[in-house]
């Protein structure tokens, strides 16, 4: 059993997946936690974006983010194959709809979660590591704004592709409690109530 939450950065994927994994007894896999290993594998295989990613900051990578996820997807796919007998809830921006389509899973097993621009900016500012990413720039505020614009565009691209390919898409704006958003995601993913436990 495989369920996937893709979408764009800072949309609440990890929070929602964590809640659902506990509730539905699924193993929560964060692609972000696997990226370093996958980048190392892809770099060893001479994938161009992965080679560049080692030495570039996020602003320089804006145009390459989409291709970066395409480059590491064979490693994501390999990971999923190795763990196919486990009940997984995998989440991450690297689960691009056209790549997920290659897995030939039911469309209900994938959801695209993207934030409104305001939600994204608010929650990025709360992440403790963001200042460290920006500290080497000459204009941190402009660099942050460019980064946000890149991710806003990425959200639009991934949402449009999900809808085109027939996948469910949900936009988060922070107006409802996390557990309510989690219930909506569970409904869209058609998570089985027979596996559900109350927490």
Predicted regions and their residues:
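ATP-binding Walker
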Residues: 10-11
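Post-Walker A helix-loop "phosphate-sensing" segment adjacent to the P-loop in P-loop NTPases
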Residues: 21-32
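Walker A/P-loop
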Residues: 14
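NTP-dependent small-molecule kinase module
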Residues: 153-199
């Amino acid at each position: 059993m495989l369920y996937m939450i893709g979408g764009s950065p800072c949309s609440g994927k990890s929070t929602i997946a964590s809640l659902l994994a506990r509730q539905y007894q699924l193993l929560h896999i964060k692609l972000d936690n696997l990226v370093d290993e996958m980048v190392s594998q892809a770099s060893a295989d001479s994938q161009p974006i992965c080679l560049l990613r080692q030495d570039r900051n996020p602003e320089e990578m804006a145009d390459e983010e989409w291709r970066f996820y395409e480059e590491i997807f064979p490693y994501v796919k390999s990971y999923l194959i190795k763990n196919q007998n486990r009940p997984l809830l995998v989440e991450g921006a690297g689960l691009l709809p056209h790549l997920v389509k290659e897995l030939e899973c039911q469309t209900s097993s994938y959801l695209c979660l993207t934030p409104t621009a305001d939600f994204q900016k608010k929650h990025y500012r709360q992440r403790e590591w963001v200042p460290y990413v920006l500290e080497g720039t000459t204009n941190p505020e402009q660099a942050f704004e460019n980064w946000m614009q890149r991710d806003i565009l990425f959200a639009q691209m991934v949402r449009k592709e999900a809808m085109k390919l027939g996948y469910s898409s949900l936009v988060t704006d922070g107006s409802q409690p996390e557990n309510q958003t989690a219930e909506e995601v569970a409904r869209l993913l058609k998570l089985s109530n027979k596996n559900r436990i109350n927490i």
